[in-house]
Amino acid sequence: IPIIMVRVCGHVAVCNSCGLELLKKIPEFPEIEKEVDLDTGLLKENAVQFYSSVLEAPSQEEVEDYIKYSAKKLNECGFTGVQSDDLASLPGKNWRRIMASYKALDARGELSIRHYEQCLFERAEDAKAFIEEGYRTGQRGDHFTVGPMKLIQDGSLGARTAAMNEPYEDSPGNTGIITFSQEELDDLFAFFDRHQMQAAVHCIGDRAMDMVIEAAAKSPYRKDNKKGRHGIVHCQITNPRILQGMKDQDL
């Protein structure tokens, strides 16, 4: 029986040998192998997310049921609006099915809560495909709105995967994990700006923030983007230089 236990932060997990064997069979395994410890079963960052690739993907009807159930529970607590980043949250990671579910519920008047979607993608090609299919920040129905593109640039402090400029004191030589290279980030920010898409990037460590600030500064289309300011989510380990850089780039 495959078993996986995910840390509360979602950035590190551990699975048994049966789970590892299944994980090694997915097409994306070569991309995430460096984040998998085959001796201990420890998974980090992207490897944590791809475990869901071995689980059965829900149908659109099931996805719609999940959304309606969650909305009902939020309504019971008095909530009328919510933001979330659902597109990579379910087995199969079928963002098209999740978007179709929200749009169908909204069209039928069955969304009981206003939903603002942070469009989370783990791979640059998926983020670009989303935009190329016509989605843009600010597109809205009655209760569903397309929000910013959400990227995860590093991990968490608890998992020692937040990207730092200096090594962790209790983990010599470890400066965390970067999801996108500087070249990839530069390309994505230019693509977002050229196609009128806002970006919100998860950054816990100072190295991750430095990379996002650099990407924003390099974008040749930055002044053409009218969809709002790009943002850094969390900004946990920062300093005056980083804060000034955010101010300079209007983040």
Where are these regions (language model features)?
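Divalent metal-binding segments
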Residues: I1-E132, L151, S156-A208, R229
